[in-house]
Amino acid sequence: MTKKYVALIFGGNSSEHDVSKRSAQNFYDAILATGKYRITVFAIAQNGYVLDPERSKRILALEDERPIVADYMTTVDQQDPLSRINALRAAGDFDIFFPVVHGNLGEDGTLQGLFKLLNKPYVGAPLRGHAVSFDKVLTKELLTVNNIRNTKYIVVDEKTAKTLTWAQVVKDLGDVVFVKAANQGSSVGVSRAKTADEFEAALTDSFQYDYKVLIEAAVKGPRELEVGVIGNEDPIVSEIGAHHVPNQGDGDAWYDYNNKFVDNSSVQFEIPANLPDAVTAEVKDMALKAYKVLDLRGEARMDFLLDENNVPYLGEPNTLPGFTNMSLFKRLWDYSDIDNVELVDKLIDYGFAEFEKNAQLSYEFVSLGEEKIGKFN
């Protein structure tokens, strides 16, 4: 049997560029370990250019990226906008894309739009699922209208933020809030505020990353939970994992970018999470419901906050969860009796299945006729 040809694409121009490389290394190894696929790699440099497979392999091996990218840029016509993706021609006729681009481009639907334009199967959620889930405000609104419990919130832009007072925030949401850029991942552009000065500083920081900012009520004494979901029409959930960041003396600690990807030595992990059976069932049910409501496919991680009364709140989905050695998503499936090799095989199968299903849809062209649209001269 001819092996399917997988194009693993990683990197990107977001703050999660280096995280993507570490995730891609694990996916690359797992794909090879299946023995079922040929594989090539494409790195997206921080300037947004897709690099050829030879240079991309060197970047995946963690060589210094700067001279590799500088050398590649001497080979392209930078006046041609299509030169940004021209390297995709180098791999020949591969069968499926496997995106491992966290943050911008990879999780906001941009790459998925390109894959659809190229008429190629790809692993993961469709464009609309990524785009909606990456926008924290749209996600909250969809969760709310579908009665999926989440925290209270306020949305502001730069104009409305000028008239919003800290007193009003405290009245509506409480005296501790989280301020988040609407379209960012991995806790980038996220701050906790418990005073007026901290709130103003948090807004300033978040507006560096987006024109729309979400202000969320904090959950008191929370336990942070994560659950993995994979599949298409009939998704399955992993065991639930919990993590706890010890208090540093300034209030409730939280799972920030540094804890996730730089140094998690102080983080206490618990897999599976020690929860009452009813809470376990509710969290898994909420995760599955959100997965379907947000039109997700392939894979996702659902993040929850559990308050001091064991009431779960869905925080946000992650449509392309990290797969580094520090990532809880990766470990959740190990504890769910699905190892890395089986997991990537399933994800690739889901990608092909979704493509084949969508290929059955009708996109009928109906001509208006020359008398309606005229002739081109």
Curated annotation (Swiss-Prot):
Recorded catalytic activity of this chain's protein: 2 D-alanine + ATP = D-alanyl-D-alanine + ADP + phosphate + H(+)
GO cellular component terms given for this protein: cytosol
Major location category of this protein: cytoplasm
Co-factor note (free text): Binds 2 magnesium or manganese ions per subunit.
Pathway: Cell wall biogenesis; peptidoglycan biosynthesis
Family according to the record: Belongs to the D-alanine--D-alanine ligase family.
The name this protein goes by in its record: D-alanine--D-alanine ligase
Highest classification ranks of the organism: Bacteria, Bacillati, Bacillota, Bacilli, Lactobacillales
